[in-house]
Swiss-Prot record:
Keyword vocabulary terms for this entry: Nitrogen fixation
InterPro entries the UniProt entry points to: CowN
Tagged with keyword Thylakoid: no
Organism: Azoarcus sp. (strain BH72)
Described function: Is required to sustain N(2)-dependent growth in the presence of low levels of carbon monoxide (CO). Probably acts by protecting the N(2) fixation ability of the nitrogenase complex, which is inactivated in the presence of CO.
Name of the protein in question: N(2)-fixation sustaining protein CowN
Length: 113
């Protein structure tokens, strides 16, 4: 019986989930190609645009801002705050019909949460 020729394996494409993750990010395979922290920072800019407006603020968003800036306790990172308050953030964006922010929130929820 002949031994398999190792060169035959070189001709076949390798099934590498990490390489595939770079083409189509999937958090269940790898976080390669997913910028969770960067997207969370951008989302915070959307949030701040609303909550820093005195006509839109309330006690909840004041506390949220304090956590973001580290005034009420240790500073929380942006991604942690998104994870913790995703439903409140969604409600904020829905209230003010901020479709771009909602799309980014959805992306973060699917890729990072």
């Amino acid at each position: 019986m002949n031994a398999p020729d190792p060169r035959d394996q070189l001709a076949r494409p390798l099934n590498n989930p990490f390489a595939e993750a770079l083409d189509k990010p999937d958090r269940y395979v790898s976080f390669c190609g997913i910028d969770c922290d960067g997207n969370a920072r951008i989302l915070m800019q959307h949030i701040r645009r609303h909550i820093d407006d005195p006509t839109k603020g309330n006690a909840f968003w004041d506390k949220f801002r304090d956590k973001l800036e580290g005034r009420s306790s240790e500073r929380c990172d942006e991604l942690f705050l998104v994870h913790s308050y995703i439903n409140m953030i969604r409600e904020l964006f829905e209230t003010y019909e901020d479709d771009d922010a909602l799309a980014l929130l959805q992306k973060i929820e699917e890729e990072c949460c």
